[in-house]
Amino acid sequence: MNDGLDVDVLTACWARLCLVLCRPYEVNGRLVCIADGIKAPKEGRRMPGVKSLHQESSGNTKPEFIMGHSLQAMSILVHAGVAGVAAIPLISRIHEGLVLSNRDTKTLLDKLVALVLWLASCWDRKVLLVADAYYASGKVIVPLLGQGHHLLTRLKSNAVAYQCAAQPDKRTRGRPAVYGQKVALKDLAKEGGAFASAASPVYGEQGVSVRYRAVQLLWRPVGRVVRFCIVHHPKRGTIFLLSTDLTLEPLEMLKLYGYRFKIELGFRQAVHVIGAYAYHFWMAQMTPVRRGDGDQYLHRKSDSYRDGVRRKLGAYHAHVQLGCIAQGLLQYLAIEHTAAVWRNFGSWLRTMNLSMPPSELVVASALRSTLWELLAVPSLAPDLAKILLKYRRCDPPPETEQVRA
């Protein structure tokens, strides 16, 4: 990996640029970010960080266990015109598979919190983080609250909370009680008379009515009052949401959590269109891994070996980060130049809504079709034209044939 490329500096510049190019989606003056994990399959035996990974959902095309890299990623919500909102990818890092020191006790939750706090410091803004139930932990909430940030997440159905303890009129010996009666959220979900009905605010749902209820109770993992929202959905069942921001309305909580799927849609585009996770860099001097192996412990390896692993890990991160930037720029073009993209698409789709921002695939195809205009006038960007002429593809990309089909 070239020492001239600092991935952290590149990421910080990209995060700041996102706020300039797009209009961020804000809630109570806070930027809304989405976090999730992705597993990139890798069969390389000499690729640092490759380990056996478990996938929750199984199927014929998605085995239960794979070998690959485990990454955690973050996106920021921005306004996307008639499409509502979009999730611009910010950062993606490998957070499993390598243990450089046996004194390192950081978990995936600790590493994600570090990403959130670092990005927030780049913006000098407060953040509302939206994540799934895996991140509903005190290890995430306490550091975020300490810096003035908030978390919106989903809870498991067996979650419990506590009422605030009643304070006696006269102070007695000992520490005053903090936690009162224990309350199971699934019991609150059975009290039908306490629920209100409203139209579903979730993106893409029309004609769907939901029943909801909000309560504020003590949650022991963080030792403070948080806001719980219980939602009865006619198709998705009962949903339990948690927000550390006590001012969020129940329907706003449901609406924001509904946007969480946009990062998963972004993962699909990153894998199948951008190729952000299609790297195959390997390390010649690395000890080969076997199928089923777990973390690679490097505290007994030589300094040169560990330096080689760090360089290779930096190469992975640089490749993925450039993929995030490329995908984000495609989304920017789709949002801000919708008509121009459709006009230069030059192909056909079964479902084409010219008033909606196109997908990354359509934008990439439009850029390819107009590449000759840039090359026809090299004086516009001589260095870029030289690079494009040297590395251009002579064969049509496979996704172009799929679109035409």
Show the residue positions of the predicted features.
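Single, function-defining residue in the core of a domain
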Residues: 14, 29, 46, 83-405
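Active-site-proximal, Lys/Arg-enriched surface segment
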Residues: 2-85, 93, 200
